[in-house]
């Protein structure tokens, strides 16, 4: 089973991190494997990529003619790849050496599997802020508290650790370009739509193998309270876009909100009474602030006319 790993990048500012991502893929224990690098419209970066990685076997390079966003770029990478499976990883993450081997084992042990994902663990470049609750790690693309059980079928895992049978992925059209980061647009949640379409076509969800591990770098700006509130707002906006495009996705969102308020917040309140600390108070406050920001973003989406058209332009 050949695997194509797609890495998309767009900025020289993250080139060092991107290079570490590439090296972690090239160091995988599994073969046969090819690496597909898609540079999203940055000619300067593409020249550097060609110099650094262009002469390595089983590395495919491509530069988009302009910045087209993460959804287009990842789909393009899958089209350029030749593997039976296509795996995605962010350009600010590093994979454990057995990442691909673990994903492939899951496919081989589950003949009906069409998508397999793994754990995305925070790699704190700066110190982890005490106020940041694990329930909201999803804001930074990492597995949050209660995300899923080992080998459970889930709607989707996060974009830095997800793989698909390549033919199925392309058959459903790949990622929806109405979603996902593009330039200065902040629409998130591009993983869910393709997984929903795959489920509707095949009846199969994503198998979550917690042993397939990717470490996601969290730079200092991603740990700032204001940035996380901003991110929460745009996540709420993105959820409104998702409701319009894929109303069937709302069940997972509602289940998460129910668990957050009725299970995790209650559990935190009990712990606060039994063993009070400043960090626990800060995290409780953050939960309510982030939740409110998500709500405001959703309402902003409700009030935005022609929302989907504006998102795609």
Swiss-Prot record:
GO terms for biological process: S-layer organization. It is found in: Cell membrane. GO terms for molecular function: glycosyltransferase activity. It comes from Haloferax volcanii (strain ATCC 29605 / DSM 3757 / JCM 8879 / NBRC 14742 / NCIMB 2012 / VKM B-1768 / DS2) (Halobacterium volcanii). Pathway: Cell surface structure biogenesis; S-layer biogenesis. Disruption phenotype: Mutants contain only hexose-modified phosphodolichols and exhibit defective or limited motility. It catalyses: an archaeal dolichyl alpha-D-glucosyl phosphate + UDP-alpha-D-glucuronate = an archaeal dolichyl beta-D-glucuronosyl-(1->4)-alpha-D-glucosyl phosphate + UDP + H(+). This is Glucosyl-dolichyl phosphate glucuronosyltransferase. It comes from the Archaea. It is an enzyme of class 2 (transferase). Involved in the protein N-glycosylation pathway responsible for the assembly and attachment of an N-linked pentasaccharide that decorates the S-layer glycoprotein and flagellins. Catalyzes the transfer of a glucuronate residue (GlcA) to a glucose residue already bound to a dolichol phosphate (DolP), a compound that serves as a glycan lipid carrier in Archaea. In vitro, is able to add GlcA to DolP-Glc in which the omega-position isoprene is not saturated. However, the likely physiological lipid substrate is alpha,omega-saturated.
